[in-house]
């Protein structure tokens, strides 16, 4: 009954009272434009999707993140949700999220109940327009990481997002030497989670707060 109540509430919040870009602001660096603003002048937009995988374990709900391997690229070593760009073979972007989740961490495509889609996030540095889909599993699914794409699978308690003590600020240095200061991040699974992933988590956090 508790599980059914949680699912009903979160689906209702996503479908009827999605916080939107206002929820992104808390975890946005000062220099970052809102996605809707940045999209006005964007070119060569690349459609993509991520999977927010929720599951029940014992008496709590957990969520999955992945850490990318170190490589020469804009997202080297970053913590993110399973996901990627849309393939021509994908029927839609939900299918993209399910496929990427299977390819990266081994969750079978047909598994997981779709709870809804959160607000799009545009990533100017890569041109990706990310659509975040929320999936729920009644138990921890079998996880098989693709070593080429995933250095580590991370798990955290979903309701920990409500703890203000998990938010801090750091300095980020990109591969090209650019340094960004006062970047907000979530400290989850002993990792600094910032950027687009933090924006998505910030909206999820507000959804959880609104469910009270």
For the regions a protein language model found, what residue spans apply to each?
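N-terminal leader/linker segments that precede catalytic domains of diphosphate-processing enzymes
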Residues: 1-80, 85-103, 107-115, 122-140, ...
């Amino acid at each position: 009954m508790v599980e059914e109540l949680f699912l009903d509430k979160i689906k209702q919040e996503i479908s009827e009272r999605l916080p939107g870009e206002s929820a992104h602001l808390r975890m946005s660096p000062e220099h970052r434009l809102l996605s809707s603003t940045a999209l006005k002048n964007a070119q060569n937009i690349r459609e993509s999707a991520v999977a927010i995988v929720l599951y029940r374990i014992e008496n709590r709900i957990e969520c999955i993140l992945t850490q990318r391997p170190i490589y020469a690229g804009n997202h080297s070593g970053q913590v993110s949700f399973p996901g990627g760009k849309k393939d021509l073979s994908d029927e839609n972007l939900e299918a993209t999220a399910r496929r990427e989740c299977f390819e990266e961490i081994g969750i079978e495509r047909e598994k997981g109940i779709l709870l809804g889609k959160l607000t799009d996030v545009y990533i100017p540095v890569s041109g990706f327009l990310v659509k975040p889909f929320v999936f729920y599993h009644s138990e921890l699914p079998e996880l098989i990481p693709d070593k080429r794409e995933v250095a580590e699978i991370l798990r955290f308690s979903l309701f920990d997002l409500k703890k203000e003590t998990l938010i801090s600020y750091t300095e980020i240095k990109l591969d090209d030497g650019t340094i960004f200061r006062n970047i907000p991040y979530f400290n989850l699974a002993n990792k600094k989670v910032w950027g687009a992933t933090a924006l998505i988590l910030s909206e999820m956090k507000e959804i959880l707060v609104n469910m009270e």
